[in-house]
């Protein structure tokens, strides 16, 4: 009997610990549930949406204590169940800054990956919060981990994708391009130094379900970047121009695509199975053969957005912004059409096949079809509301940042655009306001 009592006590404590552990974890989608909208302010997996609660200004994130785990509220990352744009069971997933200048949420497997301002001190004892740190956390809210922090992040760029069943992250810090193998103990490879621009195709999970049907994956295994010449390429002899290079993510092989003397090349997009770049002020592109170069412009333009391919694999063309007007130009043309696609001064915030999501001068958000110019209003801010400059669109849900009356920060809102054709859209606030943020 004396032996039996300690056993009962041990079983009781084990049971309590088990249920306590279960209670602390967040409900999660099934491992095989599909992911939509990777990259940006939000991402959906199954019936759950993961999103930034609000936005922190750059000045706020520079505070030495602004990003301590457990103390972040306004810009932290939340999770909720989502059904037809309605959210329930909202819960803070991680108390770290997720809503800031470089917001980027991705889900691969059962982990959420996100960027957050750096919290570590450098050699001088200063916390360089202007540098990002790539972190991960399990979807149940456990095991927050820091993965990679570059030494700088000036005019940087970040992307994630799955290639041949393995997940990679790519960080361009303004000078150096690095690759992180997340399935290989977060192994970091420096792809190239002296990089001046970088692009890669987006992972299929960044696109809507409809757009995935016509994706061209021929360039998915490559990174493309421009870099300065090295000593062997005439750097010390004053040879002008730079190098356009591709990098095979799987094999590590590098191939020079262009090294024109006195020509400066800048990579801009990888879309629809084509690499887009500029030489001087003109836009060009190449397909996956890398042998046929198309020139798209002869004049300096204000904006250049490739639309990729339609449902049948047809080329949808390019939206060019010129003299504050939109022009829809065929991929094979190099002269801007005589007639404008839109006379309005618009800014593109997202593209989903033939749908172009734009913001007008009054902060109204519209979708325009490149096929027939049909236009639908997706969102119109209320009087005295201020719209942020970050947006996220996954083909259905539009997530944006907007001011809330009597509060200092912008908080997240969601619009279910599937009701737009019937004029039924409205923005629902999903960000949870914080008392300490009151004016």
Outline where the language-model segments fall.
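Generic beta-strand structural signal
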Residues: 44, 82, 107, 129, ...
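Beta-strand-rich domains and repeat architectures in extracellular enzymes and scaffolds
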Residues: 28-77, 96-104
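Positively charged n-region of N-terminal signal peptides that target proteins for export
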Residues: 1-5
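Repeated scaffold domains used in trafficking and secretory/extracellular systems
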Residues: 35-43, 99-109, 152-164, 194-217, ...
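C-terminal motif of bacterial Sec signal peptides marking the signal peptidase cleavage site
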Residues: 18-21
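Residue position within the beta-strands of beta-propeller blades
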Residues: 50-52, 113-116, 169-171, 207, ...
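Surface-exposed loop/turn elements that mediate protein-protein interactions on large endomembrane-trafficking
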Residues: 23-31, 62-95, 125-149, 174-197, ...
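Non-cytosolic head/periplasmic domains of membrane-anchored proteins
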Residues: 114-117, 132-139, 143-161, 168-171
